């Protein structure tokens, strides 16, 4: 009997992953206003069974709040989004790695759905924020994310709906077998490289909430860096 994401049994005759097999990871940087809510949501949805890892470069109370919620905190000098998240995905050793952001924009209540899809055989489950319109997202960011998805679709030859979502689930071999090179554009790289290397990737609609706290990403400089990463990674993978 296999078990679903809540630890129950199903009748397909094979053992599936449960939340005891899941690490929820994130890079954190001065998110004291929101990180406690995110970690409480993870704890509630997973019944405290998922491991949580925060790679943190904060100068505020974020790391203390994370530790108070039972998270493993890896301190790192601030070097950018991708450096922190790359460390976060490679630190734990559980067989399923889930990435999220620490600003309370992502629906932790959909973690069981993500784990169910991994148990169905998908290697990467990627949350699509734009499916429902992402009305909570600033208009400039929303249009930019649609443009990134179009660029990635053209360059990869595969329909991509949301390249920069922060909520994904990966089988551990995916994150360990690929060399990750990007910083600001890591979120796009984390989708494009597995997609073009033949891993089973699925995008699923997710709700998206208004962020708590102030964004640290400059929309213009950050957007240019992400577009550059999409082009670079797509071409590297197409011609490798």
Label the predicted regions.
Residues 1-20, 33, 157, 181-240:
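Hydrophobic helical membrane-anchoring modules
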Residues 21-23, 51:
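Cell-envelope/extracellular polymer assembly enzymes that use nucleotide-activated donors
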Residues 26-40, 61:
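Active-site beta-to-alpha loop of glycosyltransferases that engages the nucleotide-sugar donor
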Residues 40-49:
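Short, acidic, metal-binding catalytic loop of nucleotide-sugar glycosyltransferases
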Residues 56-63:
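A conserved acidic beta->alpha catalytic loop
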Residues 76-90, 108-184, 210-221, 226-231:
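Acceptor/aglycone-binding surface of glycosyltransferases and processive sugar-polymer synthases
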Residues 97:
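Short aromatic/hydrophobic "clamp" motif used to bind/position activated sugar donors
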Residues 101-106:
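The conserved acidic donor/metal-binding loop of glycosyltransferases
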């Amino acid at each position: 009997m296999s078990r679903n994401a809540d630890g129950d049994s199903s009748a397909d005759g094979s053992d599936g992953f449960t939340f005891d097999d899941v690490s929820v990871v994130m890079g954190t940087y001065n998110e004291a206003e929101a990180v406690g809510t995110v970690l409480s949501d993870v704890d509630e949805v997973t019944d405290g069974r998922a491991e949580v890892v925060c790679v943190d470069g904060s100068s505020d109370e974020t790391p203390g709040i994370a530790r108070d919620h039972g998270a493993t905190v890896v301190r790192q000098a601030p070097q950018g989004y991708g450096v922190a998240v790359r460390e976060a995905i490679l630190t734990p050793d559980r067989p399923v790695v889930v990435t999220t952001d620490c600003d309370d924009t992502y629906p932790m209540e959909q973690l069981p759905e993500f784990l169910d899809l991994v148990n169905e055989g998908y290697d990467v489950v990627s949350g699509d924020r734009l499916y429902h319109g992402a009305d909570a997202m600033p208009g400039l960011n929303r249009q930019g994310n649609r443009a990134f998805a179009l660029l990635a679709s053209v360059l990869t030859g595969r329909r991509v709906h949301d390249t920069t979502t922060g909520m994904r689930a990966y089988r551990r071999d995916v994150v360990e077998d690929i060399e990750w090179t990007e910083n600001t554009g890591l979120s796009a790289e984390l989708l494009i490289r597995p997609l073009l290397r033949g891993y089973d990737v699925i995008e699923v609609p997710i709700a998206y909430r208004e962020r708590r706290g102030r964004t640290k990403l400059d929309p213009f400089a950050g957007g240019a860096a992400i577009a550059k990463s999409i082009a670079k990674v797509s071409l590297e993978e197409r011609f490798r």
